[in-house]
């Protein structure tokens, strides 16, 4: 075990964080995983590391969690997509980040790695994919989740400039792979894999193997420029192309949803939200589904040595894990 380094991973039982913990342990790095009391630990079964039960919005818990750690990987977040405003997510995604940054400075940690989202960076086309220099797109300005993460990014960058916080920001795109116990992004397999007929939108997005993202994040302990953002991006695929990979060997029939149908459903969803009724779909995320949400991961490949993504391998490994865990 690397006795010179202990890494705190917040939200350690989450999809990305669980893969990060595995990558750290494979490098013989000591890990402290911060999770809520009574958290579901299925994604971390069989791993030997220190578990710290606490609340990331509690200053005392945060201070105790950070104490003795030389690196912080802050992956805990409220990823709910049902809010159009950042305020309901502010306490977890912004205030908790502030508490961790303050604790990092008090305890003189060597590096702070903040896990944000690719959605804080404007997307592009296949020919001209989104990169770290792009401001957030207009569609994601109506996503409470994206805006709360963008606010947290700004707080970190201010601390870098004013108080020399040694921090880097990771912006992963849509991640796929094993150990998605919740599931989060893995819900897409539940929608696509078992069904003979699958309704898909016209658009597409960037798909990243969660293990490639985890490698880049762990490399960021010693690589990457302070204050910089890094898109952890893999392959740009339309939803139809992605379905072709997911349905490999199965007679699944793809049915394209007309744009106007999705937009209409999005309008209905936004109306329900105004009435206080939960709806996963809104006008803004309906428009995102019919857009080409594409990015490049060139910067992370060059500066963080992020390995390339094979979506086919990531999909197969994810499906194998879900089936072994009887989730598919």
Regions from the language model: what does each represent?
Residues 38-45, 49-95, 103:
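NAD(P)H-binding glycine-rich loop region in Rossmannoid oxidoreductase-like domains
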Residues 216-279, 297, 302, 309-328:
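Mid/C-terminal beta-alpha module of Rossmann-like enzyme folds, strongest
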Residues 163-165, 177-187, 220-230:
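Glycine/proline-rich active-site loop of Rossmann-fold NAD(P)-dependent oxidoreductases
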Residues 140-168:
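Active-site Tyr-X1-5-Lys
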Residues 98-144:
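Conserved Rossmann-fold NAD(P)-dependent oxidoreductase catalytic core, especially the SDR/UDP-sugar
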Residues 183-184, 201-222, 228:
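Substrate-positioning beta->alpha
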Residues 138-140, 190-208, 212:
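A conserved pocket-lining segment of Rossmann-fold NAD(P)-dependent short-chain dehydrogenase/reductase
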Residues 5-27:
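N-terminal Rossmann NAD(P)H-binding glycine-rich loop of SDR-like oxidoreductase domains
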């Amino acid at each position: 075990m690397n006795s010179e380094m202990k890494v705190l991973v917040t939200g350690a039982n989450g999809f990305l964080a669980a893969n990060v913990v595995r990558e750290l342990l494979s490098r013989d790095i000591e890990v402290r995983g911060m999770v809520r009391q009574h958290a579901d630990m299925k994604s971390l079964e069989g791993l030997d590391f220190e578990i710290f039960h606490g609340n990331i919005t509690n200053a005392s818990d945060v201070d105790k969690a950070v104490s003795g750690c030389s690196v912080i990987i802050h992956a805990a977040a409220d990823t709910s997509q049902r809010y159009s405003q950042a305020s309901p997510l502010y306490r977890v995604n912004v205030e908790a980040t502030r508490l961790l940054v303050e604790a990092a400075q008090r305890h003189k940690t060597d590096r702070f790695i903040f896990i944000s989202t690719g959605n804080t960076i404007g997307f592009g086309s296949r020919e001209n994919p989104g990169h770290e220099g792009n401001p957030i797109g207009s569609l994601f300005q109506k996503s409470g989740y994206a805006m709360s993460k963008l606010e947290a990014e700004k707080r970190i960058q201010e601390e870098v400039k004013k108080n020399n916080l040694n921090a880097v920001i990771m912006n992963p795109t849509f991640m796929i792979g094993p150990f998605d116990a919740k599931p989060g992004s893995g819900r897409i397999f539940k929608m696509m894999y078992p069904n003979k007929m699958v309704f898909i939108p016209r658009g597409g997005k960037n798909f990243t193997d969660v293990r490639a993202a985890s490698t880049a994040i762990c490399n960021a302990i010693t690589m990457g420029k302070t204050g910089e953002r890094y898109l952890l991006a893999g392959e740009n695929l339309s939803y139809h192309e992605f379905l072709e990979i997911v349905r490999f060997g199965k007679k699944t029939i793809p049915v394209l949803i007309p744009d106007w149908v999705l937009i209409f459903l999005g309008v209905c969803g936004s109306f329900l939200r105004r009435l206080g009724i939960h709806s996963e779909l809104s006008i803004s995320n309906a428009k995102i589904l019919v857009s080409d949400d594409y990015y490049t991961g060139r910067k992370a490949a060059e500066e963080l040595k992020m390995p390339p993504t094979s979506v086919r391998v990531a999909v197969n490994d994810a499906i194998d894990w879900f089936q072994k865990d009887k989730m598919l």
